């Protein structure tokens, strides 16, 4: 009777459509009908399972069977021989490079002048704000000649002195005391007083009419930059040419210089260039130690390695710009790894770059690949690493070591190169590859008052999480074990020798810079001089 009423309700629906009515609480179907329905549902479920299982065994996409556009050999050839830029300056096309004058490479916009009486704070501001690699020092604004330079190596030397981390030699002690007196009296400290603290590379000048062969020979001997002067106008400065600019010029116009162009396809291990004496520092060491090493050794950058000599970072004197504010002083007593995270954060926030500051090649890299990477990254040196060495293949790396390692990588990855004796420290735990190393932005730390209380800056700043130690960084996955370094000097020295020139020995130039270093490492604490420099506030 109930079923009949339901059928009548469907028939009386105004649309004439079959709309199912709610089923009553008591199912009126017979047991046989219900069991048949269950069997049908079960059969449908089995059919759906079989269909889903058949999808799992579906044939692969045709893309997987498509041949790659480039073979592995073609890709490797492209890496070994990257194409030079096509926008070559037509002014140099078809010309013999020996007839091109160095004056044609200068740009007047590169000139940034300060005077001998300019204060260290003003000079620091000018150096950083202008984004210039070096400032030229002249006697007065009316003079057109240069008497010296002020760059980040000079700033690093003064920073260490201001923080009380270096002590001048005996012959400069009187100048040091005079600086301390001026700082106590809050007088301006002029550059002419500061320059005595850092006897860096002497000023080198070349006439604008000198050809590129003279420049290549000069730079190949270890000179990093030359001041170009007008010899017909009382030595007036017309520009600055650096090693990087010359290497970049020769790379972009290499096809016009066959003597140089034939070197680019060759491998580093066959050319025999680069230094096997590499100075590095463990990432867990304090930043001030890295700055002291660069100052005392006369180098502009230092490799940061983990406990197995894997390169995990790079610190250069240019990075000192991040330490010129009073709030940044505690970074000096934090780890090198932490400072690398600060460098990364500054690059991301200020320059919009997202890159890890490790620039490296290996002994099987071609000269073309090496120079192209230098030009692209604007690096003055690239670390030579052994990419085949596992992170556990070597003993713990000393905190500061100058090791003699072969430039060419060994084919046996289990054989470790000779290194200096391990540091007398306990072994750190194995790297934890599951823990990411994310850079943290720079944090404001303390005010300038901490200068007079050095102990207050030793601890971890409030609100800053400790950085991941170097022992936990996956250095081997990033680069490999450090086995050498190749610099702009090495490349230009090679170009000079290939051209039949006789450049000076770069090793002798490095030795002169070490001998001329006017500072010796000390733990003397003095905050008086620092007030002048660290008055740059956030």
Curated annotation (Swiss-Prot):
Domain CBS: 106-171, 197-256, 274-331, 360-419
Biased composition (Low complexity): 21-40, 422-432
Function: Involved in DNA replication and cell separation.
PANTHER family tied to this protein: AMP-ACTIVATED PROTEIN KINASE, GAMMA REGULATORY SUBUNIT, CBS DOMAIN-CONTAINING PROTEIN
Entry annotated with the keyword Cytoplasm: yes
GO molecular function: protein serine/threonine phosphatase inhibitor activity
Name of the featured protein: Protein sds23
Superkingdom to which the source organism belongs: Eukaryota
UniProt keyword Nucleus present: yes
Lineage of the organism: Eukaryota, Fungi, Dikarya, Ascomycota, Pezizomycotina
Chain intervals with Basic and acidic residues compositional bias: 525-538
Chief subcellular location: cytoplasm
Keywords noted in UniProt: CBS domain, Cytoplasm, Nucleus, Repeat
Compartment(s): Cytoplasm; Nucleus
Family: Belongs to the SDS23 family.
Record-level GO cellular component terms: cytoplasm; nucleus
GO biological process: cellular response to glucose starvation; regulation of mitotic metaphase/anaphase transition
Gene it is expressed from: sds23
Chain residue ranges for the region called Disordered: 1-69, 386-448, 500-538
């Amino acid at each position: 009777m109930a079923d009949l009423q339901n059928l009548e309700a469907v028939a009386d629906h105004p649309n004439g459509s079959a709309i199912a009515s709610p089923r009553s609480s008591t199912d009126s179907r017979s047991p046989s009908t219900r069991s048949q329905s269950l069997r049908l549902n079960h059969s449908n479920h089995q059919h759906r399972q079989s269909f889903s299982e058949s999808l799992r065994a579906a044939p692969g996409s045709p893309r997987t069977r498509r041949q790659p556009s480039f073979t592995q050999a073609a890709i490797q050839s492209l890496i070994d021989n990257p194409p030079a830029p096509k926008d070559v300056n037509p002014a140099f096309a078809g010309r013999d490079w020996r007839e091109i004058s160095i004056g044609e490479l200068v740009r007047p916009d590169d000139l940034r002048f300060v005077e001998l009486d300019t204060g260290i704070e003003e000079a620091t501001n000018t150096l950083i704000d202008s984004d210039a690699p070096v400032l030229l020092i002249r006697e007065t604004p009316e003079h057109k000649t240069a008497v010296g330079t002020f760059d980040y190596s000079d700033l690093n030397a003064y920073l260490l002195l201001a923080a009380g981390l270096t002590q001048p030699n005996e012959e400069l002690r009187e100048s040091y005391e005079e600086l301390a007196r001026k700082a106590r009296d809050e007088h301006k400290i002029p550059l002419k007083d500061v320059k005595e603290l850092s006897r860096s590379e002497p000023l080198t000048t070349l006439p604008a009419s000198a050809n590129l062969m003279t420049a290549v020979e000069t730079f190949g001997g270890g000179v990093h930059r030359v001041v170009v002067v007008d010899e017909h106008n009382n030595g007036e400065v017309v520009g600055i040419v650096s090693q990087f600019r010359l290497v970049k010029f020769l790379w972009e116009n290499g096809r016009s210089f066959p003597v140089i162009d034939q070197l680019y396809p060759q491998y580093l291990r066959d050319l025999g260039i680069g230094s096997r004496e590499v100075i590095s520092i463990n990432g867990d060491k304090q930043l001030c130690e890295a700055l002291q090493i660069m100052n005392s050794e006369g180098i502009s950058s230092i490799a940061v390695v983990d406990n197995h000599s894997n390169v995990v970072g790079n610190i250069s004197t240019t990075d000192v710009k991040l330490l010129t504010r009073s709030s940044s002083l505690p970074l000096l007593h934090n780890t090198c790894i932490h400072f690398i995270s600060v460098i990364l954060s500054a690059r991301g926030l200020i320059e919009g770059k997202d890159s890890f500051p490790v620039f490296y090649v290996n002994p099987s890299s071609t000269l073309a690949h090496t120079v192209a990477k230098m030009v692209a990254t604007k690096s003055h040196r690239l670390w030579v690493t052994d990419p085949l060495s596992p992170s556990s293949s070597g003993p713990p790396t000393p905190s500061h070591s100058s090791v003699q390692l072969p430039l060419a990588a060994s084919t046996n990855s289990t054989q470790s190169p000779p290194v200096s004796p391990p540091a007398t420290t306990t072994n750190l735990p194995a790297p934890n590859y599951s823990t990411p190393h994310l850079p943290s932005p720079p944090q404001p730390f303390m005010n300038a008052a901490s200068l007079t209380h050095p102990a207050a800056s030793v601890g971890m700043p409030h609100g800053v999480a400790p950085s991941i130690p170097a022992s936990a960084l996956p250095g081997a996955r990033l680069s490999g074990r450090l086995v050498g370094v190749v610099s702009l000097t090495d490349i230009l020295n090679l170009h000079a020798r290939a051209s039949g020139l006789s450049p000076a020995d770069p090793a002798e130039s490095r030795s002169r810079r070490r001998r001329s270093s006017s500072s010796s490492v000390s733990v003397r604490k003095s905050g008086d001089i620092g007030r002048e420099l660290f008055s740059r506030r956030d």
